[in-house]
């Protein structure tokens, strides 16, 4: 089963190996626009700085949809730009395969802290269903040390009786210089390590192993990602959403 827990050391070795192989066969930069501004300075962690995101594209379910999802104990999604693209397709799969309601709060470019803010606001206004998908973390590569505290915050809001499904991170922006790509990869693994450590302390945190799925076949870094971060459609979108559905169904 793709979503089974990997050991931290094995997962990091596989991801690093796959990334280095892919870097040797790097394709031309993607024609798609990036969700964040070009890297001007490497910043403290080599990936640059997170650009302004508040005016970026977003997909946010209306109040009736959220209330219906909470009432039916359906599935809610908090995500970033990948979810802006893929969230509606995930919602259709949730309806078709799990036969339940779906609502989302997805905003391109938002870091985990902003997604957890939205989660807290929904918890106050609507409550939360028992299944929560967190598809954020990609925009935390610019400041990885802050991520763990936001995971803990999300889990406190969710409480022990809800399950949080967190999609791990694979970022290595192909339209940045090689040194930045390496920093992106290193910071992605740092974020994923923090997720693994949190899961050891919280049995209701389930990791969706997207990074390990990509690393298991290095070709997927090109067939399932269009720019080193965002999924291709339909291949990458279908693969990632299927992993999320598998995690929910097997919990």
Locate predicted features.
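Conserved beta-strand segments of alpha/beta enzyme cores
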Residues: 101-103, 163, 204-206
């Amino acid at each position: 089963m793709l979503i089974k827990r990997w050991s931290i050391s094995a997962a990091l070795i596989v991801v690093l190996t796959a990334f280095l192989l892919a870097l040797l066969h790097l394709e031309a930069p993607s024609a798609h626009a990036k969700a964040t501004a070009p890297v001007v300075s490497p910043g403290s962690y080599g990936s640059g700085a997170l650009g302004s995101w508040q005016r970026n594209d977003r997909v946010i379910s209306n109040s009736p949809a959220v209330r219906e999802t909470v009432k039916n104990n359906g599935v809610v999604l908090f995500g970033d730009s990948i979810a802006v693209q893929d969230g509606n397709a995930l919602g259709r799969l949730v309806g078709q395969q799990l036969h339940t309601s779906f609502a989302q709060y997805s905003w391109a470019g938002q870091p985990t802290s902003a997604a957890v803010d939205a989660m807290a606001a929904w918890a106050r206004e609507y409550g939360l269903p028992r299944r929560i998908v967190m598809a954020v973390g990609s925009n935390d590569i610019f400041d990885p040390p802050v991520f763990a505290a936001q995971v803990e915050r999300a889990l406190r809001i969710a409480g022990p009786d809800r399950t949080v499904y967190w999609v791990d991170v694979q970022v290595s922006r192909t339209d940045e210089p090689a040194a930045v790509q390496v920093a992106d990869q290193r910071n992605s693994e740092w974020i994923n390590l923090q997720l693994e450590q949190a899961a050891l302390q919280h049995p209701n945190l389930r990791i969706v192993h997207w990074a390990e799925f990509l690393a298991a076949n290095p070709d997927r870094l090109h067939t399932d990602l269009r720019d080193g971060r965002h999924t291709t459609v339909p291949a990458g979108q279908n693969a990632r959403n299927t992993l999320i559905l598998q995690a929910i169904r097997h919990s």
